[in-house]
């Protein structure tokens, strides 16, 4: 019988090759994410990740926020999203400037070639700059989409699902 779990490199860091993390599907999916995709600059990585965060945070913060059944729910959701993106950017900046900067990425079973240029102080600073720009852009784009007449009925349906009437 063949072992299902194999040693994937250094067992001290818990790098085991399981059928889940070493399958071709998982490796392709993880390596297609902006943080690990080849050929992207640090700024572009931050821009893509920030856009996703800003866009996806807007919905829950506007529909589930304390002003969800008011006329200002969209604006409140936008301001909450902008505030959260700014807080996340400050945290990323603190992480990049603490000590000697971000630690170098190690290759694992799932990510055999992590981007080394991202894990320098300069690279992390570019990533953080792209993150805030993308996060704010994603939040404003989601706000714009949610306020269009085509999406507004869907927003009202979603807001009604979680309301307490």
Curated annotation (Swiss-Prot):
Keywords recorded for this protein, A-Z: Membrane, Photosynthesis, Photosystem I, Thylakoid, Transmembrane, Transmembrane helix
Disulfide bridge partners, by residue number: none
Listed transmembrane segments: 49-67, 74-96, 127-146
Compartment list: Cellular thylakoid membrane
Record flagged with keyword Transmembrane: yes
Membrane topology note: Multi-pass membrane protein
GO biological process terms held by the UniProt record: photosynthesis
Cellular component GO terms held in the UniProt record: photosystem I reaction center; plasma membrane-derived thylakoid membrane
HAMAP family linked to this entry: PSI_PsaL
Similarity comment: family membership: Belongs to the PsaL family.
Name of the protein in its database record: Photosystem I reaction center subunit XI
Organism for this UniProt entry: Synechococcus sp. (strain ATCC 27144 / PCC 6301 / SAUG 1402/1) (Anacystis nidulans)
Gene (name only): psaL
